[in-house]
Amino acid sequence: MKKYINVAIDGPSGSGKSTAAKGLANKLGFLYINTGLMYRAYAYFLNENNLDINTNETACIEAIKNARFIFNGDDVKIDDQDVSDILRSNDVAMLASVVAANAKIRNLATNEQRKIASENNVVMDGRDIGSIVLVDADLKFYLNTSIQTRAKRRLAQNKDIEKLDYESIYNDIKERDYRDMTRDIAPLKKAIDAIEIFNDNMNLDQCVAHLYEIYLNKIKKS
């Protein structure tokens, strides 16, 4: 019999799923797992070591296996170096989309994510959590937001990290959406049993409160 409660939250880049997932996890007292940071960490690590997943897959996989990655919510360390802020840059986001399309890397990450979920009450966010990683999750959400709103949010979030303009961010998000939705391996899509939430007109507190209310209605009453 299943011992732990798993909540899956999926959605496109910049939809606020990670922030909402963290807020919901805190409200529930659950472990929060940001799977997107795993792929960003892998992408950053490979780029820093001049390794290209498209030209030297074996070396990339071995390098990742031999490195020490520590994931704790939004905090990430690679071989004891804190890279949490670096991973939020737009450049790393684009690199991560390419790395995440690799089947062997996704398999490596998916196995780790499933192991964590089997040992904890978790709120896990990503792009294929409800459809691939945790198909038996107790509750699945799909957060959706217009590209315009996502671009404005990312511009505000990254203003102290890098100099970007709205148009370049908009185009990057549009390109990433296309890649994520059309890739052969674990494409971004809403699980058939996921509850879709459009959050353009919600602030963080409203979004978390809405997810929490649904959780109480779906899980607590079951």
Curated annotation (Swiss-Prot):
Superkingdom of origin organism? Bacteria
Reactions listed under catalytic activity: CMP + ATP = CDP + ADP; dCMP + ATP = dCDP + ADP
Please list the GO terms describing molecular function: ATP binding; CMP kinase activity; dCMP kinase activity
Where located?
Cytoplasm
Q: Which UniProt keywords apply?
A: ATP-binding, Cytoplasm, Kinase, Nucleotide-binding, Transferase
Q: Which CDD domains match?
A: CMPK
Gene3D superfamilies, per the entry: P-loop containing nucleotide triphosphate hydrolases
Which residues are recorded as binding ATP? Answer: G11, P12, S13, G14, S15, G16, K17, S18, T19
Q: Which GO terms describe its cellular component?
A: cytoplasm
Residue ranges spanning the membrane: these are none
Task: Give any single GO term for biological process.
Answer: pyrimidine nucleotide metabolic process
| Position of the signal peptide | none
SUPFAM superfamilies cross-referenced by the UniProt entry = P-loop containing nucleoside triphosphate hydrolases
* EC id: 2.7.4.25
Where it mainly occurs, coarsely classed, is cytoplasm
InterPro entries, alphabetically? Answer: Cytidylate_kin, Cytidylate_kinase_dom, P-loop_NTPase
Q: Which family does it belong to?
A: Belongs to the cytidylate kinase family. Type 1 subfamily.
The molecule here is called Cytidylate kinase
Source organism = Ureaplasma urealyticum serovar 10 (strain ATCC 33699 / Western)
Gene name in the database record: cmk
